[in-house]
Amino acid sequence: MNLIPTVIETTNRGERAYDIYSRLLKDRIIMLGSAIDDNVANSIVSQLLFLQAQDAEKDIYLYINSPGGSVTAGFAIYDTIQHIKPDVQTICIGMAASMGSFLLAAGAKGKRFALPNAEVMIHQPLGGAQGQATEIEIAATHILKTRAKLNKILAERTGQSIEQIEKDTDRDNFLTADEAKEYGLIDEVMQPEK
């Protein structure tokens, strides 16, 4: 069961109830808190485009707590982040794994963050194939092309060599927030404001 909290905002015109995500959107905050599929990607892309239309100069904040998901859905979000004019700050809370870590690295350089106890996991794309040998060969060729594209982008976003990315993503590779900073996936580990 998915409960979405409601917040009440009082203004001089009365009270207004918002679901929490709509209220956060007013402050240019988008929450990616689930696996990434086409529906989630469409929602995130729509919010990014809406916020750009509202103000193309102000930063957008994308909070990520995601186990990853569909590569094509993730690329839809990634390409939109790169396409729109406002800088997108990415902040890892909890876990950014797989495509979640790819989107974490997609933020504007200098504006990619993780909380101190957040974890980041990188690996190669996963896939499966069945059917006739030719269908399996087509699927294998496609996943190898996808892996090469992901590795090239990760190398550009992190400053690591493609060879290093290939080595480090061969298996699940879990990083602490500090290790993610050292690797180049993020720029800073956020410290408590207290």
Curated annotation (Swiss-Prot):
GO terms for cellular component: cytoplasm; endopeptidase Clp complex. Keywords: Cytoplasm, Hydrolase, Protease, Serine protease. Its EC number is 3.4.21.92. GO terms for molecular function: ATP-dependent peptidase activity; ATPase binding; serine-type endopeptidase activity. PROSITE patterns: CLP_PROTEASE_HIS (PS00382), CLP_PROTEASE_SER (PS00381). The active site is at S98, H123. Gene3D superfamilies: 2-enoyl-CoA Hydratase, Chain A, domain 1. Coiled coil: none annotated. It catalyses: Hydrolysis of proteins to small peptides in the presence of ATP and magnesium. alpha-casein is the usual test substrate. In the absence of ATP, only oligopeptides shorter than five residues are hydrolyzed (such as succinyl-Leu-Tyr-|-NHMec, and Leu-Tyr-Leu-|-Tyr-Trp, in which cleavage of the -Tyr-|-Leu- and -Tyr-|-Trp bonds also occurs). The keyword Protease applies. It is found in: Cytoplasm. GO terms for biological process: protein quality control for misfolded or incompletely synthesized proteins. Cleaves peptides in various proteins in a process that requires ATP hydrolysis. Has a chymotrypsin-like activity. Plays a major role in the degradation of misfolded proteins. Belongs to the peptidase S14 family. NCBIfam families: clpP, PRK00277.1, PRK12553.1. Fourteen ClpP subunits assemble into 2 heptameric rings which stack back to back to give a disk-like structure with a central cavity, resembling the structure of eukaryotic proteasomes. This is ATP-dependent Clp protease proteolytic subunit. The gene is clpP.
